[in-house]
């Protein structure tokens, strides 16, 4: 099985920042990978929230340097929302993959079995998250873009410039 690759074309402020390409671990966490893949393509249409099940146009609302860049809340835009292709939330599939370093792609949650659409890209090793957040992919191209996003973050997570996924899809 070949794992799917997806992309985000990013803007920081009003400038194009470049493309992030991510490999999804469909061989290890197929349900989690499929959720993210389908949210990249937008192929599932409108969700229960009444909003498109699509990352296009959504922001990275929380960026903490030397930790992570978080996005995926396309319903509220501020970290309180989001929705999966399976309904509002879905279970933790497994914790086989670990938060081993920069570029790891993991699900943001609010406790066990509360995965939706929010995710984060690690900018450092974050082993304290192992067993709590499902790792489902990794950045394979565009880590420089992630580093540029990291530069507009702060200790509080607030960004100094708007960080937006202006386009996304599957390669």
Swiss-Prot record:
This enzyme's EC code(s): 5.2.1.8
Root EC class: isomerase
Gene Ontology process terms (BP): protein folding
Stretches assigned to the PPIase cyclophilin-type domain: 7-170
Keyword entries, A-Z: Cytoplasm, Isomerase, Rotamase
Compartment list: Cytoplasm
Cellular component GO terms, alphabetical: cytoplasm
Primary residence: cytoplasm
Catalytic activity reported: [protein]-peptidylproline (omega=180) = [protein]-peptidylproline (omega=0)
Recorded coiled-coil stretches: none
Cited Pfam families: Pro_isomerase
Keyword Isomerase: yes
Regulation of its activity: Binds cyclosporin A (CsA). CsA mediates some of its effects via an inhibitory action on PPIase.
Keyword match Protein biosynthesis: no
Molecular function terms from GO: peptidyl-prolyl cis-trans isomerase activity
Function: PPIases accelerate the folding of proteins. It catalyzes the cis-trans isomerization of proline imidic peptide bonds in oligopeptides.
Family per similarity comment: Belongs to the cyclophilin-type PPIase family.
Protein name stated in the entry: Peptidyl-prolyl cis-trans isomerase
